[in-house]
Amino acid sequence: INTFSSNKKIVEILDFLNKNLTNRISIDELADKFYMSRYHLMHTFKEETGCTIGSYITTKRLLFARDMIRDGSSVSAACDACGFGSYSSFIRAYRKQFHSTPTNT
């Protein structure tokens, strides 16, 4: 994930997302907050970062969860702390991202 951007608006959005990773954030809410159309937000974000907003949030959440697990937290605690809707969706996303299970971290 490219987190460097010369676009001030994208830098502000990245900062907001990083501070609110555990909250549910819709594209429409994000667009309203930063006074952009939904299309312009999604297009500009992908152009500047190389990934979609959804994949950015998921990747950051999973990295945070992996750090928690490595620091001794349980898998279920990491799942809850990172804002995943269910344990099974967390495990599925974790396997896809890291090619291993959280217990093998």
Language model regions located:
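Hydrophobic positions on the alpha-helical face of helix-turn-helix-like DNA-binding modules
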Residues: 65, 78-79
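An amphipathic alpha-helical interaction segment
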Residues: 1-15, 38-40
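Flexible coil/turn residues that form the inter-helical turn or adjacent wing/linker of helix-turn-helix
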Residues: 23, 71-73
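Basic/polar phosphate-binding segments, predominantly the helix-turn-helix DNA-binding elements
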Residues: 16-18, 24-60, 79-104
